[in-house]
């Protein structure tokens, strides 16, 4: 069950502080409460309402067995992104977004296979037979691939949902998701465009306290949905075990095969 979201916690985390009034996007006007000392203040009542919708969406997607990709390359967000994604068995990009990460996924998969080959060669001691310069080159390439791709190393197909911590910094990821029709959940500060997000949350995307709180809620919603999915699968298996009937779509197939009557085959 999801932990109750409290408005007080949102205020204490500084979730309501936006950017300078000079940097705002007019499309965020409906989600801005006002301004203070030259800085926009986000309307946390709107944020609270939208947060509950986002959490319900994440839980339902997880219950349907969808996979999630967390994207956040800001320095203050990077460690939180990795921790949250790993906690809910999801994937992440917390360094630089490589162009074509999603739209050219086959090429990315080739890079991942190359990374695995480098690791196996190093473990076998193959590099001991090479010149020092060649070993240094391969190790640099391996380190580069690990830095940028380690969070998607086990992602065998495109994600079901992409969660973007910040929009302006992750605009290339946003464009790729829109091109492929992958639903997005995006944190939007006062300088962002809500028209580029499927599901969004108006919030301070620079505050570590706010990010930690939001990601904890996201994690909990996904884990709750994943638990529902596991429970449903367990119930299906139990039903098959008891009845011997497997339900597939609208058809019911029995796992019990009737013995053929030998007499029926006689002429």
Swiss-Prot record:
Chain positions covered by the region annotation Disordered: 237-267
Keywords: Chloroplast, Plastid, Ribonucleoprotein, Ribosomal protein
Entries under Pfam families matching the protein: Ribosomal_S2
Domain of life: Eukaryota
GO biological process per UniProt: translation
Membrane-spanning residues: none
Biased composition, class Polar residues, residue ranges: 250-267
GO cellular component, one term: mitochondrial small ribosomal subunit
Keyword Transferase among UniProt keywords: no
GO molecular function per UniProt: structural constituent of ribosome
Main location: plastid
UniProt KW Chloroplast keyword: yes
Matching SUPFAM superfamilies: Ribosomal protein S2 (SSF52313)
Subcellular location: Plastid, Chloroplast
HAMAP family the record matches: Ribosomal_uS2_B
Family of this protein: Belongs to the universal ribosomal protein uS2 family.
The protein's name in its UniProt record: Small ribosomal subunit protein uS2c
Gene (name only): rps2
